[in-house]
Design a protein with these regions (language model features):
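N-terminal membrane-sensor/transducer module of prokaryotic signaling receptors
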Residues: 1-170
Length: 170
């Protein structure tokens, strides 16, 4: 009887050791899927808001330069959650908006590499031009000094020649 109990406990312990990491991985996968859905939805919402501005410009209510300024101001001030923000670069790699960082805005980032050597802006632009999608790279979180892995959703906004994105740190 005692031997059967010890054997049963050993089997249960082995099952727990095998299954618990799988359960943890399943939760990580579900969380990543939820995060992916959130950032895609947020970019689509931002694009919709930019389209409203572009429509007014196309109807002659404002110049293209003024519409782009309004769009940049919108993205600069648009946030979600506790630290969600948007950025935009031109399809040539010139930064339009990056959480209000005036030291970056207006600079060409096309050749910028992350800490792993990835030309991430080129990847972002290529993904957006191909219809939008997810890109993974390393980036420094606002207020920190070390780069962290980041997953972003990006899409092009053709009326302004922009790539708009947002993401989350993994």
């Amino acid at each position: 009887m005692r031997r059967a109990l010890v054997t049963t406990l050993a089997v249960l312990l082995n099952v727990a050791v095998i299954c618990l990491p799988a359960i943890g991985q399943s939760e990580k996968t579900e969380n990543a899927a939820a995060q992916d859905l959130l950032i895609k939805s947020q970019v689509e919402t931002a694009i919709s808001m930019l389209q409203t501005i572009a429509d007014k410009q196309q109807q002659g209510e404002m110049t293209l330069d003024h519409a782009k300024k309004l769009g940049a101001d919108l993205l600069r001030n648009l946030q979600y959650g506790t630290d969600g923000y948007f950025w935009a670069d031109t399809t040539e790699g010139v930064n339009v908006v990056l959480y209000g960082r005036k030291d970056v805005e207006g600079k060409n980032r096309l050749e910028d590499k992350d800490v792993k050597g990835t030309l991430y802006i080129k990847e972002i632009i290529a993904k957006a031009k191909a219809g939008g999608g997810y890109v993974e790279y390393w980036f420094t979180k606002k207020g920190q000094t070390d780069a962290q892995p980041k997953r972003s959703y990006v899409s092009s906004f053709k009326p302004f020649g922009w790539v708009v994105g947002t993401g989350y740190y993994r």
